[in-house]
Amino acid sequence: MAAIKYQVIKKDARTKARLGILETPHGVIETPVFMPVGTQATVKAMTPDELKEMGATIILGNTYHLYLRPGHKIIEKAGGLHKFMNWDRAILTDSGGFQVFSLSSLRKITEDGVEFRSHIDGSKHFFTPEKVIEIQNSLGSDIIMSFDECAPYPADYDYVKRSMELTIKWAKRGKKAHKNTDRQALFGIVQGGTYKDLRRECAERLVDMDFPGYAIGGLSVGEPKDLMYEIIDFTTDYLPHDKPRYLMGVGTPEDLIEGVIRGVDMFDCVLPTRIARNGTVFTSRGKLIVRDAPYAEDFSPLDEECDCYTCKNYSRAYLRHLFKAKEILAARLATYHNLYFLIKLMEKIREAIRQDRLLEFKEEFLKKYYGNREE
C-alpha cells in the first residue's frame, strides 16, 4: 500500500493550475495547499487547535532542528511527531539539507554526506542520505524528503552541476534506505539552480526513480522573481501529472498565485509567521506594518475583509500597543491573522480553479494588493 494517494480533480482551462486531493495516513488534503512551518515541532505562537480552526490540514517539521533538539529518538519514544506535538493531521518533514547548508558552520561536503557543526553548541555531526531517512522514519511524518544539496544563488554552472549530481545520487541512496513506504511517502527534490538543462536532467532522472511526489528546491534563495517563476514554469513541464508537486520555501501571497498558475500543488514558508512576530501583516490591500506610528489611533481591524479571530476582535491600535509593549499576545494575534490569510487565499485559489477563473482572480487580487502598498 502506498502511503499517499494523489488525484487531479480538475485542470484549469487556461493555466497549468490543478485542483487535487491528496490522501495521507493523517487525513485528506485539498490542493493547492499552503503548509504552515512548525520547525521545532511547533508552529511558532500557535496551538494545534488554533491551526485546525483556521483550516490547516498539513504542517511542516524540520529534520535538522529536531535531530539536534530534542533528538529524533526522544520523539520516537513519545510515539512519533504527531503524538509528541499533539497534531493528528498530516505532517511533512524536510530533509535538513537547506539548514545544513545555511545554518551550520564548518560544513564539509563529500559524496558520502555532509559533516557539520551544530548551530546550538558547535558539536560535530555527519548527515548521510541514509541517516536523514532514518531520522525521518523515527519522526513518523506522512511525507518525508530526500537529502539534497541546495546550491546558493548565484553559483557557477560547474558547481550547480556537481551539486545536482550529488542530489540525484543521494536521492537514489535515500530511496533504497526508506523502509516505511506504506506509512511515509518519500519525495525527490529537483535541484539545478537557474540552469534549465540541469533542472530538466534532474527532473527526468528523479522521475525515472518513480517517487510518489516531487519537490522543486533551490529557489527563493536570492534570484529575481521573474527568473524564479520562469524556472518553476519550466520544471513542472518535466514532472508527472499524476503526482503532487511541492515548491519549497515559497509563500508570499503573489508567489502562491504565480506558483499555482505554473502547476504547483504544495507550498511552505516561514515568512508569514516570521514577519508577524516583527509586526508586519498581510492584508487584502498589501502588507501593513502595524507597529508603525500611523496606527496608534486606528481602531479598524487589520483587514476589513478578513474574518479571522484577530480581525473580528481587535484593532490596529491595540496590536500596535501590544507590539510597542513587547507583549507576547502581539505575536500570537499577528501570526494567527497571517496564517489565516494565506490559508483562506488558497481556498479562494481552489474555488477560482473550480470556476475556471484563476487569471481573473489573480488580476483582481493583485490589483487590490498592490494598489495600496506600504513596503
UniProtKB/Swiss-Prot annotation:
Name the UniProt record assigns to this protein: Queuine tRNA-ribosyltransferase
Biological processes annotated in GO: queuosine biosynthetic process; tRNA wobble guanine modification; tRNA-guanine transglycosylation
Keyword RNA-binding: no
UniProt cross-references to SUPFAM superfamilies, sorted A to Z: tRNA-guanine transglycosylase (SSF51713)
Annotated stretches, region: RNA binding: 249-255, 273-277
Organism, scientific name: Caldanaerobacter subterraneus subsp. tengcongensis (strain DSM 15242 / JCM 11007 / NBRC 100824 / MB4)
Subunit structure: Homodimer. Within each dimer, one monomer is responsible for RNA recognition and catalysis, while the other monomer binds to the replacement base PreQ1.
Residues that, per the record, bind Zn(2+): 306, 308, 311, 337
Catalytic activity: 7-aminomethyl-7-carbaguanine + guanosine(34) in tRNA = 7-aminomethyl-7-carbaguanosine(34) in tRNA + guanine
Family statement drawn from the similarity comment of this UniProt entry: Belongs to the queuine tRNA-ribosyltransferase family.
Binding sites annotated in the UniProt record for substrate: 94-98, 148, 191, 218
Keywords: Glycosyltransferase, Metal-binding, Queuosine biosynthesis, Transferase, tRNA processing, Zinc
Pfam families on file: TGT
Pathway where it operates: tRNA modification; tRNA-queuosine biosynthesis
Cofactor needs: Zn(2+)
EC nos: 2.4.2.29
PANTHER family: QUEUINE TRNA-RIBOSYLTRANSFERASE
